[in-house]
Swiss-Prot record:
Species whose genome carries this gene: Synechococcus sp. (strain JA-2-3B'a(2-13))
Role this protein plays: Found at the monomer-monomer interface of the photosystem II (PS II) dimer, plays a role in assembly and dimerization of PSII. PSII is a light-driven water plastoquinone oxidoreductase, using light energy to abstract electrons from H(2)O, generating a proton gradient subsequently used for ATP formation.
Entry GO CC: photosystem II reaction center; plasma membrane-derived thylakoid membrane
Membrane topology, from the record: Single-pass membrane protein
Protein known as: Photosystem II reaction center protein T
InterPro entries assigned to the protein according to its UniProt record, in alphabetical order: PSII_PsbT, PSII_PsbT_sf
One Gene Ontology biological process: photosynthesis
Stretches that traverse the bilayer: 3-23
Cellular compartment(s): Cellular thylakoid membrane
PANTHER family registered for this protein in UniProt: PHOTOSYSTEM II REACTION CENTER PROTEIN T, PTHR36411
Family according to the record: Belongs to the PsbT family.
Amino acid sequence: MEAITYTFILFLTLGLLFFAVAFRETPRITKK
């Protein structure tokens, strides 16, 4: 059952990276 753990970590990392990039690269949407 290691696949679930690996998938969870992968999704968590991807989500964090996506959020960081979205918040840093798109300030116009946040300001709107």
